[in-house]
Every structure is written in structure tokens, then in C-alpha cells.
């Protein structure tokens, strides 16, 4: 009996997927999970679109002209697709929040797109791709009955290791706050919280793959809640205490928070858990109570400042970042000065600031009394100068201090590594230490958005 010669067996060439990710950390997580899902169909990730058999654009709808940016990118992909030969066809898909908002309009304006799926549907991606192979165009933007997270495969350990020692983990999705400037409730849907069991299992998978730092994600992450076996309801603070006990995990973070859901148990976690990093992104958007009301933020500036004080009392070394919108409809010079006043009171380590732009479908888009663009520009410049001054002051304040740094990747130069400080900023240090190591580092200097350090003498 002749045995088959494995050398004569033709090898199966894996299909390649390229995912371009726009926007927030949750989109990064979603792209990673889509890659994991597609691995069951023989796809491997590629960093080069020209090599790809499948290109997915995982879109964000938060900023102005998000849809036009998508159509511009699709125009370039159309040219790429036309240049392909018959033996190297290219499939194109649009996912994420612009897909949710635009739906069939994407196929109308870009007929070469094969599938359009919203952020709640990507667990069905492998099956939907099979349908496109039969020439069917797919648009799936409904909210499914099933729990998408329950239908995702386990993390691919090899892929996790390649991504590094820090990882995102979505625990909450959607938003019920309906801020008048924001599209998230319309593109991500109502707030849902994943179960403690699901979150714990996924965290364990990440840790087993070598992850040392996990950032919990949610559009309103501190709105997370879940029931445990005895029927008791947990909030995010309880979840953090629970995850802090997992063997092998060295650091925890979470983002993005709403001031309304920043409760005492969560503040206590900042006080009690060394594993919870002293950094908090807590957007406020405006310092004017009148504008906060128009934005439907459901709190006043004094409430926000009181929270900042309570959190700093619990964790004195904490650094705050925030979000600010200038030029919201009806914003006066006095309103803007209230924002400047709040920023000076808080003293941020970093912050994001933007000009208001109306998002289709939001209440803000129907408001009158819009602020002149030149006024918006001037206010934004004023704000960014102030915020940059605060960022530089924060960076300088850490020079001479010694802090723990998580080594994440190889640096640009030989013998150099880059790590992550407790305040999220990168630290460059000369060391041969392995990734995943937490080292005591003396901060020698600071750049515009990073530190330079050396191994501390212990």
C-alpha cells in the first residue's frame, strides 16, 4: 500500500483580511474580534491592503464628515478592485457606526461594496461572507435578538500575543443618556452590560495569552451592572474588585465614563486597588450649566467638580483627562469662559477638544442660534493652548519621580524599550527587559507627550 507523500499535497493558501479601523478604542476591540471570527473561515490578518482578499472598513460616526471620509476611501478601493485579476478577486465590506447610520445608502453610492453590517452584527460576519460569495449584497443593521458576545469565538492566543501585553475588553455597549450632540444611542443602541461570567472568562483568556493590562471598555462604561449568583446586583466598582483578584493580571483601566454614573463604590475602588491605574478619562464637554442643560448632560458643573475632588481625595496621584466641545448652539462668550474656568480648576493631564458639528439625527442638529465658525475657531485655539499648558505642566511634574512602568514594546533604537506609565503616557527607557515586565523607573525627562526614564536604583 502506497502512502501519500505529504510533500506532494498542495498547501492551502490562507485568505487575507485587512481591516481599517476608524475612531474609538471600542472599534479597535471590534476589529480584533472580527479578525478572530474570520480565522475560523481561514482568514489571516494582513497589514497591507494590496495583499488582502477581503477589506473591511470599520467606521466611526462621531466626527463631522465621517460618511464623506468613508466614501472617499471607498473610491480608492474601487480603483484597487478594478485593477485586480480574476484569480485575485477583492471583497469589500463596511462595518461600524457609519454602516449602521447609512445602511443601504452605502450600496447606492458605492455599488462595489459586498456587505454592510452594523456594530451589533459582526458576530454573524463569517456566515454573511458566505452569502456574498453567491453574488448577494448584504445589508444587516438590525439589532439582533441574540447576544453577539455569546456567539464570538474564544480569543486567538497567537493573535493576542502579537497585539501585545495590553488589551481592550468591552464590558458595556450603547448609551441611554441621549446627549443632544451625540449619535451613539442611534448607532450603538441602548445600554447593554455583559455578564460577570462572560467578562471573567474573556479576561482569563487574555491573561493566559500573556496580557498584563486590561482596559474595560464601554460607551458609558461606569453604567455597567450585572447580577451574580446570589441575585445581588454589581456595579463597575464591584467588577473591578473581582477582576483584580485574577492571577497574572498586573493592571486595570476603564474608559469612557459619564459623571452621572461615577458612584461611591467606583471611587472606593480607586482608593483600594493598586492594580487600578491612577488615570481617569471623565468627559464634561462644557463648564457652563446652561450649555450642559442644552446638551442634556444631566448634571451641573459643580457636580463634576465635586466628583473630581472626591476622586482626588481617594487617589491623590490620579491624573484626569476630558473632552470639550466649543461652539455648541447658543454658546456665548460667558459660557465659554465658564469652560475655561472649570479647566483651570481641574488641571488636566490631557484632554480632547473639538468644534461642535451637528450630527444628523441628533437633537442638536435641529437647534438654532449656531455659533459662527470663526468664533468656534478662536475658542478652540484658546482652549487648546490652555490644555497644552496643563499637559506640559503635568509632564514636568513627574520629572524626578520614580514610578512603575509596564514594558510594552521594542523602542526605535538598539537596547531601548517603550513602556506605559500609570498615567497612560509612554516611557522610553534603555533596558533589555522583556515585554510584560513591570519595572521601577526614574523619570529623567519629558517630551511633548512622553517620558524618558532610567532603571531606578532599588
From Swiss-Prot:
Transmembrane regions: none
Mind listing the GO molecular function terms for this protein? 4 iron, 4 sulfur cluster binding; metal ion binding; N6-isopentenyladenosine methylthiotransferase activity
Listed CDD domains: Radical_SAM
Kindly give the SUPFAM superfamilies that the UniProt entry links to this protein.
Radical SAM enzymes (SSF102114)
Compartments annotated for it: namely: Cytoplasm
Keyword Ribosomal protein set for record: no
Tell me which cofactor or cofactors this protein depends on. Answer: [4Fe-4S] cluster
Q: Tell me which residues make up the TRAM domain.
A: 396-457
Catalysis performed (reactions): N(6)-dimethylallyladenosine(37) in tRNA + (sulfur carrier)-SH + AH2 + 2 S-adenosyl-L-methionine = 2-methylsulfanyl-N(6)-dimethylallyladenosine(37) in tRNA + (sulfur carrier)-H + 5'-deoxyadenosine + L-methionine + A + S-adenosyl-L-homocysteine + 2 H(+)
- Class of this enzyme: transferase
This protein's name:
tRNA-2-methylthio-N(6)-dimethylallyladenosine synthase
What species was this sequence derived from?
Answer: Bartonella quintana (strain Toulouse)
Taxonomic lineage: Bacteria, Pseudomonadati, Pseudomonadota, Alphaproteobacteria, Hyphomicrobiales
Amino acid at each position: 500500500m502506497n502512502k501519500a507523500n505529504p510533500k506532494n499535497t498542495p498547501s492551502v493558501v490562507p485568505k487575507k483580511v485587512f481591516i481599517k479601523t476608524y475612531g474609538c478604542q471600542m472599534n479597535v476591540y471590534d476589529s480584533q474580534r472580527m479578525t478572530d471570527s474570520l480565522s475560523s473561515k481561514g482568514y489571516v490578518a494582513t497589514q497591507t491592503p494590496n495583499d488582502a482578499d477581503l477589506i473591511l472598513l470599520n467606521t466611526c460616526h462621531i466626527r463631522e464628515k465621517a460618511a464623506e471620509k468613508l466614501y472617499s476611501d471607498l473610491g480608492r478601493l474601487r480603483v484597487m478592485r478594478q485593477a485586480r485579476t480574476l484569480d485575485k478577486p477583492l471583497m469589500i465590506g463596511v462595518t461600524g457606526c457609519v454602516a449602521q447610520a447609512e445602511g443601504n445608502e452605502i450600496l447606492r453610492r458605492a455599488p462595489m461594496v459586498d456587505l454592510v453590517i452594523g456594530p451589533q452584527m459582526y458576530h454573524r460576519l463569517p456566515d454573511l461572507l458566505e452569502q456574498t460569495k453567491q453574488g448577494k449584497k448584504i445589508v444587516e443593521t438590525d439589532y439582533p435578538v441574540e447576544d453577539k458576545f455569546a456567539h464570538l469565538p474564544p480569543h486567538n492566543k497567537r493573535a493576542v500575543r502579537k497585539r501585545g501585553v495590553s488589551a481592550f475588553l468591552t464590558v458595556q455597549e450603547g448609551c441611554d443618556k441621549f446627549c443632544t450632540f451625540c449619535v451613539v444611542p442611534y448607532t450603538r443602541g441602548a445600554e447593554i452590560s455583559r455578564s460577570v461570567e462572560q467578562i471573567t472568562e474573556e479576561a482569563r483568556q487574555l491573561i493566559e495569552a500573556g496580557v498584563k493590562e486590561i482596559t474595560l471598555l464601554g460607551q458609558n462604561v461606569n453604567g455597567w451592572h450585572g447580577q451574580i449568583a446570589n441575585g445581588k446586583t454589581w456595579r463597575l466598582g464591584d467588577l473591578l474588585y473581582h477582576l483584580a483578584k485574577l492571577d497574572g493580571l498586573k493592571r486595570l483601566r476603564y474608559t469612557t465614563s459619564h459623571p452621572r454614573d461615577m458612584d461611591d463604590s467606583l471611587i472606593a475602588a480607586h482608593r483600594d486597588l493598586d492594580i487600578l491605574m491612577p488615570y481617569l478619562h471623565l468627559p464634561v464637554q462644557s463648564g457652563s450649566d446652561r450649555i450642559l442643560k442644552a446638551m442634556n448632560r444631566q448634571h451641573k458643573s459643580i457636580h463634576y467638580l465635586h466628583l473630581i475632588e472626591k476622586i482626588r481625595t481617594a487617589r491623590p496621584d490620579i491624573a484626569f483627562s476630558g473632552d470639550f466641545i466649543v461652539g455648541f448652539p447658543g454658546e456665548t462668550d460667558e459660557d465659554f469662559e465658564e469652560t475655561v474656568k472649570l479647566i483651570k480648576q481641574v488641571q488636566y493631564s490631557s484632554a480632547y477638544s473639538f468644534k461642535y458639528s451637528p450630527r444628523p439625527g441628533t437633537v442638536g442638529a435641529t437647534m438654532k442660534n449656531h455659533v459662527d465658525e470663526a468664533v468656534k475657531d478662536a475658542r478652540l485655539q484658546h482652549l487648546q493652548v490652555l490644555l497644552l499648558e496643563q499637559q506640559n505642566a503635568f509632564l514636568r511634574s513627574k520629572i524626578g519621580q520614580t514610578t512603575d512602568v509596564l514594558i510594552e514594546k521594542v523602542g526605535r533604537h538598539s537596547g531601548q524599550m517603550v513602556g506605559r506609565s500609570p498615567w497612560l503616557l509612554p516611557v522610553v527607557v534603555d533596558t533589555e527587559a522583556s515585554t510584560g515586565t513591570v519595572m521601577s523607573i526614574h523619570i529623567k525627562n519629558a517630551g511633548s507627550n512622553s517620558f524618558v526614564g532610567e532603571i531606578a536604583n532599588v
